[in-house]
Amino acid sequence: HVYLHKIGEEYKNDKKIFSDRRDKEEWPNVKISPSGRYLFVIAEKGWEFCNVFMKDLKTNNDWIELTTNVTGLFEIVPAEKHFYVKTNYDAPKYRIFKATYEKPDFENWKEIIPETKFTLESANIVNNKIILSTMENAISKLYIYDNDGKLEREIKLPTLGKVGAIHSEIDINYFYYSFSSFNFPKTIFKYNLDEKSDVKIYQTSTKLKFDDIEVKQIWYKSKDETPISMFLVHKKGLKLN
């Protein structure tokens, strides 16, 4: 169930606004637009199905069901004038759609970033830009797109590794992201969109001497000739034989 709670009021006064007569096995996730006007509920059922609903809190009209029994997962990323959808519907490695609040129905969604051979892991909106994190050959990549899905640039990461959590606000020109690797302790960076650069905010303290550790990515073929990626982590200068 989803309840509306107003800060400062007793929880007993909370009003149930979603889930009446819904499947008890559904798990609702909630997103709200920056203006606070449009509320989304993504009712997930397992890892294959979910239905997406939207409600205009200003007009208080009935819920609009944007998807109905569609095989796929949907993540709503609200922005000021549009909302974006990250989904694996007909795209196992995910893609991005763009839609308006005025015409939010599924048939009006426009694909702006198609599926590629790499997995799209996360999507964030920052100051009218789309920040995408992807997994490419077991390595994280970080990209900046404009709000229509045109690639602007790739953010250079410190080394081969994994991008973790990305935290952003829609109306500011920077965002935070975490990064770590075999020879790079977990670090939080602040990336400035205007300056096109990042600064280190925090790094996990450790006594290990990471400068003495070398990381290489190599490829080999499995029994059925499938290419397999493997990382070699060893002391710098070690002769491999």
For each feature predicted by the language model, list its residue ranges.
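Peripheral, non-catalytic segments that deliver or gate enzyme domains
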Residues: 1-240
